[in-house]
Amino acid sequence: MKQDIKSMTLAELQDAFAALGEPKFRAKQVFTWLHRGVVGFEVMTNLSKTLREKLDSLYFITAPTVARKQISKLDGTIKYLWKLRDGNCVESVVMQYHHGNTVCISSEVGCPMGCKFCASTIGGLVRRLEPSELLDQVLFSQLDSGLPISNIVLMGIGEPLDNFDNVMRFLELVNSPDGMNIGMRHISLSTCGLVDKIEKLAERDLQLTLSVSLHSPDDESRSKIMPVNRRWPVDTLLAACRDYFAKTGRRISFEYTMIDGVSDSPEQAQLLAKKLAGMGAHVNMIPLNNVTESGLHTSSKQAIHRFQTILEENGITATLRRTLGSDIDASRGQLRRKYESN
């Protein structure tokens, strides 16, 4: 069975090439070709024909195809639906900011977490993405859009920490000086709160930004919209976050979806401020995107402003997320589901 060569690190490639009797620099040449987005060994013209044929007999190169592409008329945001090698689909979104271009990528096909307000979880988890499939979303978004990618957010379909090992390998690949060379400080990873994996991530001491999907400061309301809270309640999660902050020195961003009558009361704002005190935390307030199946609605502008004011009066930095691409199915998972239902 052929192996996925793009999921291999440079060191692994060098070992594989040594086993073939090839010098290490050949492995580096191939690594560079792969991270430029080539889709076949035949284009690697600085390799001998014999070596190219040998590699083709041992390995395959992942390369997603564009199943659908949407460009926002409002702000130029580009949303991709990628068709993978096995026919499954995932989404990526390219967003343009004054400080550079950011790609939001998926970590899984579907999602096992069951958050009530998120379209990605409808239908559950299909499978986890390979490191190469994570990398391809960055690489091919850049190649197709013509926009140099400077920042990555793992906030698309799936729970990144549920795919821990493959995500860690992807980070190593995309951070490689011989590859795309995107710095860890330019990468954000979002989790709904897998405490054991947050603890594991803290041990790695990576300089990325950890974003925690909190969405409520109390167990009663959080458990209703996020089943993960029944496994790891709010206080258990926040204890892990404090430990992460202490070990890494990296400020955590807390994602907080504003849901009418569920997460937007003044009392919840006060409780949230109390629980986040002393963490150097930042709260990223997010107006709820419409997901018909959820039966939930976004908070009013007045409720959002009131909530933000209470946080800031209590010393918590809070910002309202700028909504991009609202005219091209802004909610996670919507594009994939619409495509697959056709």
Question: Where does each model-flagged region fall?
Answer:
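Canonical Radical SAM [4Fe-4S] cluster-binding loop centered on the CxxxCxxC motif
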Residues: Q96-E133
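Conserved alpha-helical substructure of the radical SAM core
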Residues: T121-N151
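Auxiliary Fe-S-binding modules of radical SAM enzymes
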Residues: M1-N88, R242-R250, Y256-N342
